[in-house]
């Protein structure tokens, strides 16, 4: 494999290379942990199905470009799996430790992912560099892993999970999957030219936040985000990753009741969560922030739009990779509007972006093709007094992992979790995933300098969702 990075993958690459993003994780909890030999067999099966798992990003000196290429050395079990016998839980300390300590290097014959196993919790966490895959990809990887785990296979003694193929060729260069085929209307050709020139000559016109965007008095950016920032051109940034982590759950019955309410109001769970955060923000004392509106970022899975617009067969071609666009929604405060009214507005924005405006949404992502991703990232930090959005809601949805939650199986998924590190794009984040056995699992990550400030905010959410 010799694959060009898409524009968004190039953005993720530079963000990680600057040390501004370590990894994210999607984890599963099993009824019991497999034996090592069973893990080896399942991993071999998974790696065969998803070639990207055998790749790293390498710089081609001749072409002066980065490519996703197959690793040229074997990968052993110990390269991909680490046991954490010392962790009795996945709490705030452990979560922040993951984002502080686990990251991945480029231009090396090493993987861009790892599985952490917490034996005391029967839990397995897939940690991955974002350049390799998005959140839905991690779901697909776990689905494949569980398929391999259920198969009756010979006992594995050889711990080599991957061996470079003698027949594999790195000569043929493949374009970034599908993004290169996406239609660019004439007006977007004009926008691309304009953005390219503006970012080069007047970067603030492209990256500067609206001055009315909410910023907290107790959150100084980038001071409360970074421990270090480059001073001599060689030093990297260092993100604190000391966020407070609050997790809440909704039982399957409770989740079903809320989903029925969403259905009755023609909204989705994602829209409701976004509206709930907007409404609860009204409980925060006005002197704690400046600005008049919140901005929500809602990452959108664009696999189905790709299939629809490019007339692709519905297969596993889009299983693992980065196929996301971001929906932005602005909410003006103090409008005295109800939760379902706000949720309906958010839902309209989601529906419009995923249907009528999907050509535009993907072309917004493709604007990263015409600017320097690295400069854009650095400008976002140096030219602003806060992240570009107030909060992010990423909902991976209700996942059965292709029936891997079926309790009649020898190994089945009991629960799932999902989380991401402190970042440059939002002040706090909600990472959500739901399963049949344990319902909804939401991880909320926010700066520890805002713990007291946000107490009324979270209390309102607890009261609304009956989290007692």
From Swiss-Prot:
A Pfam family it matches: AATase
Location relative to the cell: Endoplasmic reticulum
Keywords, in A-Z order: Acyltransferase, Endoplasmic reticulum, Transferase
Enzyme class (EC, first level): transferase
Record EC number: 2.3.1.-
Species, as recorded: Saccharomyces cerevisiae (strain ATCC 204508 / S288c)
InterPro entries for this protein: Alcohol_O-acetyltransferase, Atf2/Sli1-like
UniProt record, GO biological process: response to xenobiotic stimulus
GO molecular-function terms, A-Z: N-acetyltransferase activity
GO cellular component term, pick one: endoplasmic reticulum
Name listed for the protein in its UniProt record: N-acetyltransferase SLI1
Upper taxonomic lineage: Eukaryota, Fungi, Dikarya, Ascomycota, Saccharomycotina
Protein's job: Confers resistance to the sphingolipid biosynthesis inhibitor drug myriocin (ISP-1). Inactivates ISP-1 by converting it into N-acetyl-myriocin. Cooperates with YPK1 in mediating resistance to myriocin.
